[in-house]
C-alpha cells in the first residue's frame, strides 16, 4: 500500500491509502484504537472477526478496538480508501 497522512496527531489519524490489485494486509488488531475505513474507489474485501464483508466506493465500515481485521483488494483495479484511527494506530498493531 501507498499511504499519505492527511491528519496526524496523538488522538486522531487520517490516512489516504492506495492498495494495488490482488494484495492484502496482514490480519491484525489494535489494543486501543478504533478505526473507520471509507472506500473512495473500488471494492474492499474485509475479514472482520472471522466474517467476510464487501465494502464498495462511498461506503464505510467501522472496526472496534481489539477486533481482528484484514483488508484485501481482490479486484482488477486499485483500491483507494481513507482510514480514520482514534487514537492513532501507530505502535498499536498486533499482527496475527
Model-derived segments and spans:
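Double-stranded beta-helix
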Residues: 11-13, 17, 72-96
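Short beta-strand His + acidic residue motifs that chelate non-heme Fe in jelly-roll/DSBH
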Residues: 27, 46-47, 63, 69-75
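Short acidic-glycine-tyrosine-enriched beta hairpin
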Residues: 50-65
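Short, conserved beta-strand element in jelly-roll/cupin
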Residues: 18-20, 29-46, 84
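A short glycine-rich, His/Asp/Glu-containing loop-to-beta-strand
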Residues: 1-27
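Structural motif
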Residues: 43-45, 52, 68, 78
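Short, surface-exposed secondary-structure boundary micro-motifs
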Residues: 66-67, 86
